[in-house]
Every structure is written in structure tokens, then in C-alpha cells.
């Protein structure tokens, strides 16, 4: 760290990191470098099920909320193993759980019941939106679903984007559905949302649109520090929007 102080400090905003299978030693390196900027770690989709050293990995991540991917919940639900899943989460010492319906056909009322049920024992992150890039829903539906899941007990609602930013709040080309996001934000407090933003372009857009304290998800481990610089205005993409003064030169 430099000997001088720019007066730049992180002021809120969750950074939700996606893990695709890093080992314990890799996570030790990640935490040593960027642990101060990581708020939640998601073990993507069903990777936890096939990770042989999962307990060791969770020990390294101790102190960080860890959640298993929502797709794994969908598999468990489809096989009627919800009670076994709850027990396993408890045995692993996990306090957070993600519930989604991005792939399976889960009736709306049933999803709300499950959120309410899991919220008795866990901190629930629910996810809204389909993983099917061709599935498009009207903004009012997103708003209705998000509000319903928050009322059912979800701590935060994740807006689907996939790890590649090609579904949900994104078009298949990767372009942001800005009108959809704006309408959601008009009706729902953005503090209750986690926007999936796996690319630098999407991260910068959210920081400029909603400020440095916006909650962002599906952040790759190697992108945690770059995202932090976007939040603090230490990167050209957000320098003018974040730092005081509107006429700062950008080189």
C-alpha cells in the first residue's frame, strides 16, 4: 500500500463471487490478495457435489458466507431430497442457501413456500429469471416475482445473468437489458438485489447507474480487485462518476 492516502474507502456494496472449482490452496491465495473485498462465495451450480476436498475448502473459506449454487437446489428438489439437503447444509456448517427456478418448472406458490420454509433455518438468497437465453419475461413479472420472494423471506434476490452474462437481465448477445433493469430498480430497493455482472462492462454499467454500493454477483475470483477499483473510481470506466468533481481528466 502507498504511504499516501487518497481518502478512498469502500462504502457498502456486496461482492458475490462465483467459484467454479478452485482448490483450498488457490483460495488461500485469493483471500490473501482480495479477501477484504469478498462478501459471499457461491460454489457454482453442482460443483460442491463433486468436490472431494470440500470440507477442507470450506475451512479455508471460514468467515465468509458460502452458498451452493441454485441449480444444485433445483436438482435436489427434482429428486425429492430437500430434507437431506438441509441436513447436509447443516453438517457443512453453511448458513446461507440459494433457491432458484432457472431451469426446472417450479410453480410460483411452491417456490414462495420453499423460501419461507428454508428461511426458518438459513439466510435465503433467491434467484429470479430463466437460464434459457430465449426466455423473455415482462418487467412487471420480474417486479412481481422479486417482491413476492422478498416478502416470503428472501434476504436478497439475485437477478439471473448466468456466469457468461447471456440470459435473464442480458440478451443472448451479452447486451444488458437496460430498460428491464431500470424498471426493476424503480419498483424495488436495489439494496435488496444482487445483480449478476460477470464482465467488466456490466460491472461498470451498474456502478455508474446505481453507485459504488450496488450489490454485484457472479464475480470471478480474479475480477474481485478490478471490481473494487471500479467501485472506488480507480479505473477509467468509472473515474468521473465515482470521484468528486465532474471535469477530472481521464488519460
Functional labels for PLM-detected ranges:
Residues 11-25, 44-47, 67-81, 127-141:
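Active-site mouth loops of central-metabolism enzymes
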Residues 1-60:
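Conserved N-terminal beta1-alpha1 strand-loop-helix module at the mouth
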Residues 29, 81-88, 137-151, 199-212:
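Catalytic cores of alpha/beta
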Residues 30-34, 58-61, 88-92, 117-118, ...:
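Generic structural signal for hydrophobic
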Residues 1, 183-251:
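C-terminal alpha-helical cap/extension of soluble enzyme domains
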